Amino acid sequence: MKQHVNIALFVPHQGCPKDCVFCNQARITGRKRENMLTEETVRRSIEEQLTTVHSGQEVEIAFFGGSFTGLPRSYQTMLLTVAKEYVVTGRVHGIRLSTRPDYIAPHIMEYLISYGVTTVELGCQSLDDEVLNLSKRGHTAAQVEQAVQVIRQYPSVQLGLQILPGLPGDTLEKSVRTAEAIVELAPDFTRIYPALVIAGTELEWLYATHQYKPLSIEEAVRWTAEIWLPLLKAGIPVIRMGLHASDDLRGEGTVLAGPFHPSFRQLVEEELFRRLLKRMMERIALGSTASLQVLIHPADETALRGRKGESWKQALSILSDTGSKASLILDRNLPRRQLGWRMEEGPVQSLAFTDL
């Protein structure tokens, strides 16, 4: 499969009809709201980013940070006209954009298709109406479903859905139900961004006045793991977990509270490997004199071992207390996100994330 690359162009908060309680796109993207892209700046940015692209990579020009289809039509046309030139000449493979569910309709899709748009991401955030209302999204869960139905009438367009667990009024149960509802909507991919308290948002005020409590890192990891599992079992990729750790987000006074971590996805994978290790320990005969071999794909070794190797050390300690010994074997033939084991030369048994 070809590696995917985005040529990122930011339209922070532009096209949005209102301020959601969690949003400050200028802070998140590092671009100011009033910095409108021009034809010249679009071309310059695309050309600069194309110098880093290698042959064999699948490239999309991606408009991030706002509700693209809410922009003035003349501005949309300027941006898409420039982007389409690169599609027509074969220098990029398509165009990606993000927007609101209530800013999608058949005539809008016809317009986007005419300019070569290949991917639309919808910021659904939650499929619980109470959470959407408290977050001042201005749309309902039903409107998300309607937008998905419209986009699915155009098979050439990939559909992505973004989820923000931990918003006001959210619970683990609601977030899991959102994930299960998303499975029914069958997007091509998803993103999971646990809610953060960003400076300059209404969430900052709610947090300061003790009306909102963000998830801790530990809670966000557990919630995201529970959200990811139904998506994994349905074969729906989660292409990002946690906001990208941009220089602006890392800056002092930007993220005021919440589960921000530069390696958030790895924390979630560590959590699920801990669960697999626990399941494995329940299945093997502790105290056996036979040596235990634990097999893992090399790319998963860090997640299996856990932070500072704690998960693996704990497993070894339990085995040692019962008189058993174990060794870790790296096996490229083992699928990713799967744990295998065998007693000496016995048959290999295995468990995957999808078995949890």
Model-found features: residue ranges?
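N-terminal pre-triad scaffold of radical SAM enzymes
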Residues: 1-30, 47-65, 69, 98-100, ...
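Auxiliary Fe-S-binding modules of radical SAM enzymes
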Residues: 2-5, 212-356
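A general structural motif
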Residues: 4, 56-58, 92-94, 117, ...
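Short glycine-enriched loops at secondary-structure junctions
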Residues: 12-16, 193-198, 244
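Short acidic/His/Gly/Ser-rich catalytic and metal-binding motifs that mark active-site loops
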Residues: 18-20, 198-204, 249-251
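Conserved non-cysteine loop/helix-boundary elements of the Radical SAM core domain that shape
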Residues: 28-40, 65-158, 163-221
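Alpha-helix termini
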Residues: 49-55, 86-89, 284-285, 318-319
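Residues at or immediately flanking beta-strands
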Residues: 60, 94-96, 158-160, 291-293, ...
